Amino acid sequence: LHWMVHSFPTRRSSDLNVLDYGAVRHDEAVVHGGSRSQFFEFIAGAEFICGHNIFAHDLKYLEKDFANHGLAEAGIIDTLHFSPLLFPRKPYHHLVKNDKLQSDELNNPLNDAIKCKELLLEELEAFNQLKAGFQDILFLLLHNQHEFSAFFKLLNFSGCENDLHKHISTEFADKICKNADLPEIIRANPVELAYCLALINVFDHDFKESPDQSSITPPWVSRNYPDVEKIMFQLRSQQCADGCSYCNQYLDIHSGLKRWFGYDEFRCYDDKPLQEIAVAAVVKENRSILAVFPTGGGKSITFQLPALMAGENAHALTVVISPLQSLMKDQIDNLEHSHHITCAATINGLLDPIERQKAYERVEEGSASILYISPESLRSRSIERLLLGRNIARFVIDEAHCFSAWGQDFRVDYLFIGEFIKQLQQQKQNRRQI
């Protein structure tokens, strides 16, 4: 090896003093203990220093010491930032869960450093296995970004100097909208675009059969780069006015109806295509709508089809607020038994603890694109945390008369729905209206 990598985490006390240092070098030499001087003597002269979540944590406490020990010019590599780019496909990398490095021992910096080195080497190998075109795209988007530049220097990778807009359009033809404003996205959100493209690379449009349907953006990415959700919407869920090969195929509501439900056309009432009008307003125009249908009139399809298409195209979650647990079960059973659609879940009081945990996991991991809950569930902190970790396509209020009709049976938690959505959007720092 012609480079030096020191992978190190630190353990801190509650008063923010560093208690324990750990590092491993490329030649397998290690250091572990509470001696600051021994630690910096060990890492002296490093060209590159690697850690997991090092920018957000370790550097806060050691950056000044780096400068004092001649390490100001060392390249800093954060394995956390590259994990979603290079292992975007579920089950992701076995050493990473959300933003945490999976380790055999708690509070052992040396063990963490060894795992971090292992992860780095696998990330380098994963990058080398990418198609040359996507390697160039990642380089052109990220090589000038502080959190990413050292990785490419370590690889001595320079990429090509192609027109990035044209390069992405070519590599992702038929995978994103041809008329999305790529030049502006590249200018304003290069990191977010990189995370979106990495995930799109593993999308499989045969959504019903593919195990890749549940590959999603890790919650820490959405939290630190909230515009990822907005950009994914622009690339994959916003139908262009001119029409393009992607939008015509994957945002066409008639082909979606056939693909998901097996129907050739929408149902009409008094010769009016009410179902089609409602679905088009959601999918084509991204509008919030009120749809009033007679009992048994096919109302459910007007929100289920857009939800399934949003799950297919952007792996987004649609939250359906329903007044009755039995109604939730009936709709999920109908999707499964009549249409073989298994990406809907419910979390309600009828579930035993094991069933409830499995439902949470399905939503958290991305294998559910429709979630049925009661209005009371919005008071739950666990539900709030769950939804914060997913890209939310929209909220649906099923049986909307429960929301508007006052009386002795009125459930006051319906009044909280609007406030909850507002708070959720503020917490997600998402500039795209839910």
What is each model feature region?
Residues 288, 292, 297, 302-344, ...:
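Conserved SF1/SF2 helicase motif Ia
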Residues 385-390, 405-432:
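Short, conserved "post-DEAD/DEAH" coupling segment immediately C-terminal to helicase motif II
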Residues 308, 333, 351-394, 402-408:
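Conserved helix/coil segment N-terminal to the catalytic DExD/H
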Residues 1-13:
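Short, small-residue-biased leader/transition segments that mark boundaries at the very start
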Residues 95-182, 196:
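Acidic, Mg2+-coordinating catalytic module of metal-dependent nucleases/exonucleases
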Residues 25-93, 101-102, 106-127:
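Conserved DEDDh/DEDDy metal-dependent 3′-5′ exonuclease domain
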Residues 65, 69, 327-353, 358, ...:
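Conserved helix-turn-beta segment of the N-terminal RecA-like "Helicase ATP-binding" lobe
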Residues 241-292:
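Conserved pre-motif I regulatory segment
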